[in-house]
């Protein structure tokens, strides 16, 4: 059975059929208007979580280069506010994954498309994002031997679809083929 999730703009879908487990439903729990799970609407979440044999991939998708994107020229993925918001999605989603028993090492992947985006700007975003994720924390706490996070990547859709591991979960235009 095919397992595909469509991103919030309805223009791209990710095929998670090859995953051991996956979800796009963390948001449903965190933003429950009836507060069934507590008053936790302040929590942020990644768009997709994908379990591989070795990792849990926490995937955040932002595409300011699609037709109809609101003010793409104003989108600045390197701003302090944007970086902190994206990093918060990793931390907040980790709680839900822990409760689900998904305790494999994490990889945070930020799929980022925007008008001025290129591999150099994505690398700069990655380096700034890495400073906000728990890499330093886990390296300074000795004697435990556990990791919260193994890697962070900031990739374009094309880079996602050509990555040796990530291409197993193709990201494609709805009704089309990968670009």
Describe the residue ranges of each PLM region.
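Conserved catalytic cores of phosphodiester-cleaving nucleases, focusing on short active-site segments
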Residues: 48-50, 55-65
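Catalytic cores of nucleic-acid endonucleases
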Residues: 64-115
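Residues at beta-strand starts and edge strands
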Residues: 44, 55, 104-106
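Short, low-complexity, polybasic intrinsically disordered segments
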Residues: 107, 111-164
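Short linear motifs at secondary-structure transitions and domain/linker junctions
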Residues: 20-25, 33, 81-88, 128
């Amino acid at each position: 059975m095919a397992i595909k999730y469509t991103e919030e703009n309805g223009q791209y879908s990710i095929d998670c059929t090859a995953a051991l487990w996956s979800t796009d439903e963390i948001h449903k729990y965190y933003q429950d208007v009836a507060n069934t799970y507590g008053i936790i609407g302040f929590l942020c979440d990644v768009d997709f979580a994908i379990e591989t044999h070795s990792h849990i991939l926490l995937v955040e998708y932002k595409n300011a280069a699609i037709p109809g994107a609101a003010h793409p020229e104003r989108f600045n993925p390197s701003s302090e506010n944007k970086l902190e918001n994206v990093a918060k999605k990793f931390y907040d989603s980790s709680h839900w994954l822990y409760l689900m028993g998904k305790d494999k090492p994490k990889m945070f992947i930020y799929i980022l498309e925007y008008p001025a985006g290129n591999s150099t700007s994505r690398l700069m975003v990655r380096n700034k994002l890495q400073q906000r994720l728990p890499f330093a924390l886990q390296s300074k706490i000795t004697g435990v031997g556990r990791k919260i996070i193994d890697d962070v990547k900031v990739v374009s859709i094309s880079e996602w679809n050509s990555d040796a591991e990530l291409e197993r979960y193709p990201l494609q235009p709805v009704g089309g083929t990968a670009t």
